[in-house]
């Protein structure tokens, strides 16, 4: 990983980042297809959405690049006060993805470290994120940075019998 760089994303990075984002959606959908959406045109939709975000204030969109090839990204932004979530304005990490070929080599750690730094530089008094309950490796990474569990989302599907809690 000596040639790894973490940098601000550029417009030319968006097709690769959109592919990564689509893979992240598919990963979550595979975990729980009732909870996580998966629609046609994910790549184009993400490319269009992130193109607008790239030009927005308070957005952190970073690319991990090794040997001139993208191998991960993180998307975060400063979010305003949210009364529904009882949350003051904060930095929120929405996506972090590392290509499977370079996982467990420090790319995710470097992306997360830089995203936190950039959000704090933008004035975030705290950084929050969500992670799938089943994604234990991500939870360990986030925990190593001092993230703690503050909420637990629970979902119930209409018309389905209750499942026993473990």
Where are each of the predicted segments found?
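A conserved beta-turn-beta hairpin within the catalytic core of GNAT-like acetyltransferases
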Residues: 80-93, 103, 150
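Conserved acetyl-CoA pyrophosphate-binding loop and the N-cap/start of the following alpha-helix
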Residues: 102, 106-114
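Conserved active-site alpha-helix within GNAT-family acetyltransferase domains
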Residues: 109, 133-151
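Conserved beta-strand in the GNAT
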Residues: 63, 69-78, 92, 97
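Conserved GNAT-fold acetyl-CoA-binding loop/helix
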Residues: 22-49
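Conserved N-terminal entry element of GNAT/NAT acetyltransferase domains
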Residues: 1-15, 160-166
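A short helix-loop-beta-strand connector motif used in the catalytic cores of GNAT acetyltransferases and
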Residues: 48-62, 92
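Conserved GNAT acetyl-CoA-binding A-motif
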Residues: 120-130
């Amino acid at each position: 990983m000596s040639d790894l760089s973490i940098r601000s994303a550029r417009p030319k990075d968006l097709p690769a980042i959109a592919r990564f984002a689509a893979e992240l959606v598919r990963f979550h959908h595979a975990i729980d297809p009732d909870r996580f959406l998966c629609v046609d045109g994910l790549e184009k939709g993400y490319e269009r959405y992130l193109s607008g975000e790239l030009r927005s204030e308070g957005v952190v969109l970073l690319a991990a690049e090794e040997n001139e090839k993208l191998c991960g990204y993180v998307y975060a932004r400063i979010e305003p006060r949210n009364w529904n979530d009882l949350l003051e304005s904060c930095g929120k990490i929405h996506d972090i993805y590392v290509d499977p070929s370079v996982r467990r080599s420090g790319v995710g750690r470097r992306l997360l470290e830089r995203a936190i730094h950039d959000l704090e530089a933008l004035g975030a008094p705290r950084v929050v994120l969500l992670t799938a309950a089943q994604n234990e490796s991500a939870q360990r990474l986030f925990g190593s940075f001092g993230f703690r569990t503050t909420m637990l989302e629970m979902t119930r599907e209409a018309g389905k019998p209750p499942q026993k809690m473990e």
